[in-house]
Protein backbone atom coordinates (compact mmCIF):
# COMPACT_ATOMS: atom_id res chain seq x y z
CA UNK A 1 0.00 0.00 0.00
CA UNK A 2 1.07 3.59 -0.51
CA UNK A 3 0.42 6.65 1.60
CA UNK A 4 0.86 9.31 -1.08
CA UNK A 5 -2.85 9.67 -1.74
CA UNK A 6 -3.79 9.88 1.92
CA UNK A 7 -4.17 13.39 3.26
CA UNK A 8 -1.92 14.02 6.28
CA UNK A 9 -3.62 15.22 9.44
CA UNK A 10 -3.97 18.93 9.94
CA UNK A 11 -3.10 20.78 13.11
CA UNK A 12 -5.40 19.81 15.96
CA UNK A 13 -7.28 22.82 17.30
CA UNK A 14 -8.88 20.95 20.18
CA UNK A 15 -8.26 17.41 21.43
CA UNK A 16 -11.12 14.93 21.67
CA UNK A 17 -12.80 15.05 25.07
CA UNK A 18 -15.49 12.71 26.35
CA UNK A 19 -18.56 13.79 28.40
CA UNK A 20 -16.56 13.41 31.63
CA UNK A 21 -13.70 15.68 30.63
CA UNK A 22 -11.22 12.92 29.79
CA UNK A 23 -8.95 13.65 26.83
CA UNK A 24 -8.93 10.81 24.31
CA UNK A 25 -5.46 10.61 22.79
CA UNK A 26 -4.80 6.86 22.64
CA UNK A 27 -6.19 4.55 19.94
CA UNK A 28 -5.93 0.76 19.94
CA UNK A 29 -6.73 -0.87 16.61
CA UNK A 30 -7.27 -4.58 16.10
CA UNK A 31 -6.14 -5.24 12.55
CA UNK A 32 -7.24 -8.90 12.59
CA UNK A 33 -9.18 -11.26 14.83
CA UNK A 34 -6.99 -14.18 13.74
CA UNK A 35 -4.21 -15.60 15.85
CA UNK A 36 -1.77 -18.50 15.69
CA UNK A 37 -2.43 -19.24 19.39
CA UNK A 38 -5.65 -20.22 21.16
CA UNK A 39 -5.03 -18.91 24.67
CA UNK A 40 -7.53 -20.32 27.15
CA UNK A 41 -8.56 -16.89 28.51
CA UNK A 42 -8.87 -15.26 25.09
CA UNK A 43 -10.69 -17.51 22.64
CA UNK A 44 -12.18 -20.91 22.06
CA UNK A 45 -9.95 -23.65 20.65
CA UNK A 46 -12.32 -24.10 17.70
CA UNK A 47 -12.73 -20.35 17.22
CA UNK A 48 -14.71 -19.23 14.18
CA UNK A 49 -13.04 -16.19 12.67
CA UNK A 50 -14.56 -13.40 10.65
CA UNK A 51 -14.68 -13.81 6.87
CA UNK A 52 -11.73 -11.91 5.42
CA UNK A 53 -14.13 -9.95 3.24
CA UNK A 54 -15.61 -8.36 6.38
CA UNK A 55 -12.30 -6.83 7.44
CA UNK A 56 -11.27 -3.30 6.63
CA UNK A 57 -8.55 -3.17 4.01
CA UNK A 58 -5.11 -1.98 5.05
CA UNK A 59 -5.77 1.25 3.17
CA UNK A 60 -9.01 1.74 5.09
CA UNK A 61 -7.25 1.05 8.38
CA UNK A 62 -4.66 3.66 7.46
CA UNK A 63 -7.31 6.23 6.64
CA UNK A 64 -9.24 5.47 9.83
CA UNK A 65 -6.14 5.75 12.03
CA UNK A 66 -5.12 8.95 10.26
CA UNK A 67 -8.54 10.47 10.92
CA UNK A 68 -8.08 9.85 14.64
CA UNK A 69 -4.58 11.30 14.54
CA UNK A 70 -6.02 14.40 12.89
CA UNK A 71 -8.39 14.66 15.85
CA UNK A 72 -5.68 14.50 18.49
CA UNK A 73 -4.64 10.87 18.99
CA UNK A 74 -0.96 10.85 19.95
CA UNK A 75 -0.43 7.15 20.66
CA UNK A 76 -1.45 4.34 18.33
CA UNK A 77 -1.23 0.66 19.20
CA UNK A 78 -1.87 -2.13 16.68
CA UNK A 79 -3.33 -5.30 18.18
CA UNK A 80 -5.23 -8.41 17.17
CA UNK A 81 -5.76 -11.32 17.35
CA UNK A 82 -2.10 -11.45 16.49
CA UNK A 83 -1.34 -8.39 14.33
CA UNK A 84 1.77 -9.87 12.74
CA UNK A 85 -0.15 -12.72 11.09
CA UNK A 86 -2.13 -10.35 8.86
CA UNK A 87 -0.78 -10.46 5.33
CA UNK A 88 1.23 -7.38 4.31
CA UNK A 89 0.63 -5.72 7.69
CA UNK A 90 4.13 -4.21 7.61
CA UNK A 91 3.01 -2.00 4.73
CA UNK A 92 0.43 -0.52 7.11
CA UNK A 93 3.05 0.05 9.79
CA UNK A 94 5.39 1.70 7.30
CA UNK A 95 2.62 3.93 5.98
CA UNK A 96 1.47 4.98 9.45
CA UNK A 97 5.05 5.78 10.42
CA UNK A 98 4.81 8.96 8.35
CA UNK A 99 2.86 10.47 11.24
CA UNK A 100 5.86 9.89 13.49
CA UNK A 101 8.06 11.77 11.04
CA UNK A 102 5.70 14.76 10.91
CA UNK A 103 5.33 14.85 14.69
CA UNK A 104 1.57 14.28 14.50
CA UNK A 105 2.01 10.99 16.38
CA UNK A 106 4.19 10.44 19.44
CA UNK A 107 4.21 6.67 19.46
CA UNK A 108 3.38 3.77 17.17
CA UNK A 109 3.56 0.39 18.85
CA UNK A 110 1.94 -3.02 18.96
CA UNK A 111 0.95 -5.88 21.22
CA UNK A 112 2.02 -9.32 20.02
CA UNK A 113 2.32 -12.89 21.22
CA UNK A 114 5.90 -12.83 19.96
CA UNK A 115 5.61 -15.77 17.59
CA UNK A 116 6.41 -13.66 14.52
CA UNK A 117 8.80 -11.16 16.11
CA UNK A 118 11.98 -12.85 14.91
CA UNK A 119 10.78 -12.25 11.36
CA UNK A 120 9.58 -8.66 11.75
CA UNK A 121 11.50 -7.04 14.63
CA UNK A 122 14.17 -5.33 12.52
CA UNK A 123 11.61 -3.94 10.07
CA UNK A 124 9.42 -2.69 12.91
CA UNK A 125 12.37 -0.80 14.33
CA UNK A 126 13.17 0.61 10.90
CA UNK A 127 9.59 1.93 10.69
CA UNK A 128 10.00 3.93 13.88
CA UNK A 129 8.42 1.49 16.31
CA UNK A 130 10.35 1.88 19.55
CA UNK A 131 8.72 -0.66 21.82
CA UNK A 132 6.43 -3.67 21.81
CA UNK A 133 4.35 -5.47 24.40
CA UNK A 134 4.68 -9.24 24.35
CA UNK A 135 1.98 -11.41 25.90
CA UNK A 136 3.75 -14.20 27.79
CA UNK A 137 2.25 -15.97 30.78
CA UNK A 138 4.84 -18.61 31.64
CA UNK A 139 8.40 -19.75 30.98
CA UNK A 140 7.51 -23.41 31.46
CA UNK A 141 7.20 -25.08 28.02
CA UNK A 142 4.50 -27.52 29.11
CA UNK A 143 2.43 -24.86 30.85
CA UNK A 144 2.93 -22.56 27.87
CA UNK A 145 1.45 -25.23 25.61
CA UNK A 146 -1.48 -25.73 27.98
CA UNK A 147 -2.26 -22.01 28.12
CA UNK A 148 -1.78 -21.21 24.42
CA UNK A 149 -2.90 -24.64 23.16
CA UNK A 150 -0.87 -24.18 19.94
CA UNK A 151 2.11 -22.06 20.94
CA UNK A 152 5.86 -22.73 20.80
CA UNK A 153 7.69 -21.09 23.72
CA UNK A 154 11.13 -21.23 22.09
CA UNK A 155 9.82 -19.32 19.09
CA UNK A 156 8.44 -16.59 21.35
CA UNK A 157 11.69 -16.32 23.29
CA UNK A 158 13.60 -16.07 20.01
CA UNK A 159 11.25 -13.28 18.98
CA UNK A 160 11.90 -11.39 22.21
CA UNK A 161 15.65 -11.75 21.65
CA UNK A 162 15.26 -10.44 18.09
CA UNK A 163 13.25 -7.46 19.30
CA UNK A 164 15.87 -6.55 21.90
CA UNK A 165 18.66 -6.97 19.34
CA UNK A 166 16.79 -4.61 17.00
CA UNK A 167 16.71 -2.00 19.74
CA UNK A 168 13.05 -2.36 20.63
CA UNK A 169 12.07 -1.91 24.26
CA UNK A 170 10.05 -4.94 25.35
CA UNK A 171 7.42 -5.12 28.07
CA UNK A 172 5.96 -8.46 29.10
CA UNK A 173 2.22 -8.73 29.77
CA UNK A 174 1.11 -11.74 31.81
CA UNK A 175 -2.41 -12.82 32.65
CA UNK A 176 -2.36 -14.44 36.09
CA UNK A 177 -4.28 -17.73 36.13
CA UNK A 178 -5.26 -19.52 39.30
CA UNK A 179 -3.76 -22.98 39.55
CA UNK A 180 -1.70 -22.40 36.42
CA UNK A 181 1.00 -19.74 36.49
CA UNK A 182 0.25 -17.93 39.77
CA UNK A 183 3.19 -19.55 41.58
CA UNK A 184 5.55 -18.72 38.72
CA UNK A 185 5.16 -14.94 38.94
CA UNK A 186 8.32 -14.36 41.05
CA UNK A 187 10.55 -16.27 38.61
CA UNK A 188 8.87 -14.61 35.61
CA UNK A 189 9.51 -11.23 37.21
CA UNK A 190 13.17 -11.99 37.92
CA UNK A 191 13.66 -13.16 34.34
CA UNK A 192 12.04 -10.09 32.81
CA UNK A 193 13.82 -7.63 35.09
CA UNK A 194 17.12 -9.43 34.54
CA UNK A 195 16.82 -8.62 30.83
CA UNK A 196 15.78 -5.03 31.46
CA UNK A 197 12.14 -5.64 30.59
CA UNK A 198 9.13 -4.47 32.56
CA UNK A 199 6.43 -6.91 33.60
CA UNK A 200 2.73 -6.11 33.88
CA UNK A 201 0.34 -8.56 35.54
CA UNK A 202 -3.28 -8.66 34.40
CA UNK A 203 -6.38 -10.08 36.05
CA UNK A 204 -8.57 -12.39 33.97
CA UNK A 205 -11.32 -10.32 32.37
CA UNK A 206 -14.90 -11.61 31.93
CA UNK A 207 -15.09 -11.28 28.13
CA UNK A 208 -16.30 -13.87 25.64
CA UNK A 209 -17.22 -17.42 26.58
CA UNK A 210 -16.83 -18.19 30.29
CA UNK A 211 -17.71 -21.49 31.89
CA UNK A 212 -16.74 -22.94 35.24
CA UNK A 213 -13.16 -23.45 34.07
CA UNK A 214 -12.84 -19.85 32.98
CA UNK A 215 -14.37 -18.52 36.19
CA UNK A 216 -12.01 -20.64 38.27
CA UNK A 217 -9.01 -19.06 36.52
CA UNK A 218 -9.55 -15.77 38.31
CA UNK A 219 -7.17 -14.72 41.07
CA UNK A 220 -7.12 -11.17 42.48
CA UNK A 221 -3.82 -9.40 41.97
CA UNK A 222 -4.03 -8.05 45.51
CA UNK A 223 -3.24 -11.62 46.58
CA UNK A 224 -0.30 -11.85 44.18
CA UNK A 225 1.06 -8.53 45.42
CA UNK A 226 0.79 -9.68 49.03
CA UNK A 227 2.73 -12.84 48.20
CA UNK A 228 5.45 -10.87 46.42
CA UNK A 229 5.68 -8.42 49.31
CA UNK A 230 6.73 -11.25 51.60
CA UNK A 231 10.04 -11.55 49.73
CA UNK A 232 10.44 -8.32 47.78
CA UNK A 233 10.29 -4.61 48.56
CA UNK A 234 7.60 -3.04 46.37
CA UNK A 235 7.71 0.74 46.21
CA UNK A 236 4.72 2.48 44.65
CA UNK A 237 5.64 4.69 41.70
CA UNK A 238 3.76 7.96 41.22
CA UNK A 239 4.21 8.02 37.47
CA UNK A 240 1.40 6.77 35.28
CA UNK A 241 1.05 6.28 31.55
CA UNK A 242 -2.55 7.43 31.73
CA UNK A 243 -3.53 3.80 31.33
CA UNK A 244 -4.91 1.06 33.56
CA UNK A 245 -1.67 -0.16 35.12
CA UNK A 246 -0.45 0.88 38.54
CA UNK A 247 3.30 0.44 38.93
CA UNK A 248 5.78 -0.43 41.65
CA UNK A 249 9.55 -0.61 41.67
CA UNK A 250 10.93 -3.91 42.88
CA UNK A 251 13.94 -2.78 44.88
CA UNK A 252 15.73 -6.14 44.79
CA UNK A 253 15.65 -6.34 40.98
CA UNK A 254 15.54 -2.66 40.07
CA UNK A 255 12.72 -3.39 37.65
CA UNK A 256 9.20 -2.09 37.24
CA UNK A 257 6.13 -4.23 37.92
CA UNK A 258 2.64 -3.24 36.84
CA UNK A 259 -0.79 -4.38 38.01
CA UNK A 260 -3.92 -4.16 35.85
CA UNK A 261 -6.93 -4.90 38.03
CA UNK A 262 -10.21 -4.37 36.16
CA UNK A 263 -12.23 -6.44 38.63
CA UNK A 264 -10.74 -5.40 41.97
CA UNK A 265 -9.86 -1.78 41.14
CA UNK A 266 -10.97 -0.27 37.88
CA UNK A 267 -9.03 2.34 35.98
CA UNK A 268 -11.89 4.32 34.49
CA UNK A 269 -11.25 7.74 36.01
CA UNK A 270 -8.16 8.28 33.87
CA UNK A 271 -9.22 6.38 30.75
CA UNK A 272 -7.79 8.07 27.67
CA UNK A 273 -8.44 5.44 25.03
CA UNK A 274 -10.86 3.88 22.59
CA UNK A 275 -10.66 0.65 20.62
CA UNK A 276 -11.48 -0.14 17.00
CA UNK A 277 -12.05 -3.63 15.66
CA UNK A 278 -10.80 -4.94 12.34
CA UNK A 279 -14.30 -4.42 10.91
CA UNK A 280 -14.39 -0.73 11.81
CA UNK A 281 -16.47 -0.91 14.98
CA UNK A 282 -15.46 1.50 17.72
CA UNK A 283 -15.74 0.46 21.36
CA UNK A 284 -15.27 3.39 23.71
CA UNK A 285 -15.16 1.13 26.78
CA UNK A 286 -13.62 -2.32 27.14
CA UNK A 287 -16.20 -3.29 29.75
CA UNK A 288 -19.37 -2.21 27.93
CA UNK A 289 -21.24 -3.60 24.95
CA UNK A 290 -21.33 -0.10 23.45
CA UNK A 291 -20.42 -0.01 19.76
CA UNK A 292 -20.60 2.37 16.84
CA UNK A 293 -20.02 1.58 13.18
CA UNK A 294 -17.27 3.63 11.54
CA UNK A 295 -17.02 1.47 8.44
CA UNK A 296 -20.20 2.89 6.91
CA UNK A 297 -19.17 6.57 7.09
CA UNK A 298 -15.62 5.60 6.11
CA UNK A 299 -16.87 4.05 2.88
CA UNK A 300 -19.67 6.53 2.24
CA UNK A 301 -17.44 9.39 1.14
CA UNK A 302 -13.91 9.92 -0.15
CA UNK A 303 -13.39 12.73 2.35
CA UNK A 304 -13.47 12.39 6.12
CA UNK A 305 -16.33 14.73 7.04
CA UNK A 306 -18.85 11.96 7.73
CA UNK A 307 -16.21 9.84 9.44
CA UNK A 308 -15.12 12.71 11.67
CA UNK A 309 -18.71 13.37 12.71
CA UNK A 310 -19.23 9.67 13.51
CA UNK A 311 -16.09 9.66 15.64
CA UNK A 312 -17.30 12.72 17.55
CA UNK A 313 -20.66 11.06 18.18
CA UNK A 314 -18.99 7.89 19.48
CA UNK A 315 -16.66 9.79 21.80
CA UNK A 316 -19.67 11.74 23.06
CA UNK A 317 -21.27 8.50 24.24
CA UNK A 318 -18.26 7.09 26.09
CA UNK A 319 -19.49 5.81 29.48
CA UNK A 320 -18.06 6.94 32.79
CA UNK A 321 -16.84 3.48 33.68
CA UNK A 322 -17.32 -0.24 33.40
CA UNK A 323 -18.82 -2.80 35.73
CA UNK A 324 -16.69 -5.88 35.21
CA UNK A 325 -17.93 -8.77 37.31
CA UNK A 326 -17.67 -12.54 37.10
CA UNK A 327 -21.20 -13.91 37.29
CA UNK A 328 -20.64 -17.28 38.94
CA UNK A 329 -24.34 -18.04 39.27
CA UNK A 330 -25.12 -17.82 35.56
CA UNK A 331 -21.62 -18.27 34.06
CA UNK A 332 -22.15 -15.09 32.09
CA UNK A 333 -19.45 -12.68 30.96
CA UNK A 334 -19.74 -8.95 31.53
CA UNK A 335 -19.14 -8.52 27.80
CA UNK A 336 -20.04 -11.17 25.23
CA UNK A 337 -17.38 -10.36 22.60
CA UNK A 338 -14.02 -12.12 22.72
CA UNK A 339 -10.88 -10.18 23.57
CA UNK A 340 -9.44 -11.24 20.21
CA UNK A 341 -12.23 -9.31 18.48
CA UNK A 342 -12.01 -6.22 20.67
CA UNK A 343 -8.24 -6.06 20.54
CA UNK A 344 -5.99 -6.84 23.49
Swiss-Prot record:
<keyword id="KW-0479">Metal-binding</keyword>
<dbReference type="GO" id="GO:1904047">
    <property type="term" value="F:S-adenosyl-L-methionine binding"/>
</dbReference>
<feature type="binding site">
    <location>
        <position position="39"/>
    </location>
    <ligand>
        <name>[4Fe-4S] cluster 1</name>
    </ligand>
</feature>
<feature type="binding site">
    <location>
        <position position="42"/>
    </location>
    <ligand>
        <name>[4Fe-4S] cluster 1</name>
    </ligand>
</feature>
<keyword id="KW-0408">Iron</keyword>
<comment type="similarity">
    <text>Belongs to the radical SAM superfamily. MoaA family.</text>
</comment>
<dbReference type="GO" id="GO:0061799">
    <property type="term" value="F:cyclic pyranopterin monophosphate synthase activity"/>
</dbReference>
<keyword id="KW-0004">4Fe-4S</keyword>
<feature type="binding site">
    <location>
        <position position="77"/>
    </location>
    <ligand>
        <name>GTP</name>
    </ligand>
</feature>
<feature type="binding site">
    <location>
        <begin position="273"/>
        <end position="275"/>
    </location>
    <ligand>
        <name>GTP</name>
    </ligand>
</feature>
<dbReference type="InterPro" id="IPR007197">
    <property type="entry name" value="rSAM"/>
</dbReference>
<keyword id="KW-0949">S-adenosyl-L-methionine</keyword>
<feature type="binding site">
    <location>
        <position position="268"/>
    </location>
    <ligand>
        <name>[4Fe-4S] cluster 2</name>
    </ligand>
</feature>
<dbReference type="InterPro" id="IPR013785">
    <property type="entry name" value="Aldolase_TIM"/>
</dbReference>
<keyword id="KW-0456">Lyase</keyword>
<keyword id="KW-0501">Molybdenum cofactor biosynthesis</keyword>
<keyword id="KW-0547">Nucleotide-binding</keyword>
<comment type="subunit">
    <text>Monomer and homodimer.</text>
</comment>
<dbReference type="GO" id="GO:0005525">
    <property type="term" value="F:GTP binding"/>
</dbReference>
<dbReference type="GO" id="GO:0061798">
    <property type="term" value="F:GTP 3',8'-cyclase activity"/>
</dbReference>
<feature type="binding site">
    <location>
        <position position="205"/>
    </location>
    <ligand>
        <name>S-adenosyl-L-methionine</name>
    </ligand>
</feature>
<comment type="function">
    <text>Catalyzes the cyclization of GTP to (8S)-3',8-cyclo-7,8-dihydroguanosine 5'-triphosphate.</text>
</comment>
<feature type="binding site">
    <location>
        <position position="171"/>
    </location>
    <ligand>
        <name>GTP</name>
    </ligand>
</feature>
<dbReference type="GO" id="GO:0051539">
    <property type="term" value="F:4 iron, 4 sulfur cluster binding"/>
</dbReference>
<dbReference type="Pfam" id="PF06463">
    <property type="entry name" value="Mob_synth_C"/>
</dbReference>
<protein>
    <recommendedName>
        <fullName>GTP 3',8-cyclase</fullName>
        <ecNumber>4.1.99.22</ecNumber>
    </recommendedName>
</protein>
<feature type="binding site">
    <location>
        <position position="135"/>
    </location>
    <ligand>
        <name>S-adenosyl-L-methionine</name>
    </ligand>
</feature>
<keyword id="KW-0411">Iron-sulfur</keyword>
<feature type="binding site">
    <location>
        <position position="28"/>
    </location>
    <ligand>
        <name>GTP</name>
    </ligand>
</feature>
<feature type="domain" description="Radical SAM core">
    <location>
        <begin position="19"/>
        <end position="239"/>
    </location>
</feature>
<feature type="binding site">
    <location>
        <position position="81"/>
    </location>
    <ligand>
        <name>S-adenosyl-L-methionine</name>
    </ligand>
</feature>
<dbReference type="InterPro" id="IPR013483">
    <property type="entry name" value="MoaA"/>
</dbReference>
<dbReference type="InterPro" id="IPR000385">
    <property type="entry name" value="MoaA_NifB_PqqE_Fe-S-bd_CS"/>
</dbReference>
<feature type="binding site">
    <location>
        <position position="285"/>
    </location>
    <ligand>
        <name>[4Fe-4S] cluster 2</name>
    </ligand>
</feature>
<dbReference type="InterPro" id="IPR006638">
    <property type="entry name" value="Elp3/MiaA/NifB-like_rSAM"/>
</dbReference>
<dbReference type="GO" id="GO:0006777">
    <property type="term" value="P:Mo-molybdopterin cofactor biosynthetic process"/>
</dbReference>
<dbReference type="GO" id="GO:0046872">
    <property type="term" value="F:metal ion binding"/>
</dbReference>
<dbReference type="InterPro" id="IPR050105">
    <property type="entry name" value="MoCo_biosynth_MoaA/MoaC"/>
</dbReference>
<dbReference type="Pfam" id="PF13353">
    <property type="entry name" value="Fer4_12"/>
</dbReference>
<feature type="binding site">
    <location>
        <position position="111"/>
    </location>
    <ligand>
        <name>GTP</name>
    </ligand>
</feature>
<comment type="pathway">
    <text>Cofactor biosynthesis; molybdopterin biosynthesis.</text>
</comment>
<feature type="binding site">
    <location>
        <position position="271"/>
    </location>
    <ligand>
        <name>[4Fe-4S] cluster 2</name>
    </ligand>
</feature>
Amino acid sequence: MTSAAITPPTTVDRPMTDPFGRTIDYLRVSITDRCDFRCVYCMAEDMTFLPRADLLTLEELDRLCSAFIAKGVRKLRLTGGEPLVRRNMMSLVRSLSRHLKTGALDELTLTTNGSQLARFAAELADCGVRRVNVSLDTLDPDEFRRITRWGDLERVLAGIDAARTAGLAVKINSVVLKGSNEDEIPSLMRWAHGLGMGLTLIEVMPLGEIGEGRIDQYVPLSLIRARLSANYTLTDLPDSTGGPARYVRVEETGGRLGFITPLTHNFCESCNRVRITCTGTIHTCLGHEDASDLRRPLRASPDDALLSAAIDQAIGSKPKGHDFIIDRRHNRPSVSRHMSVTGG
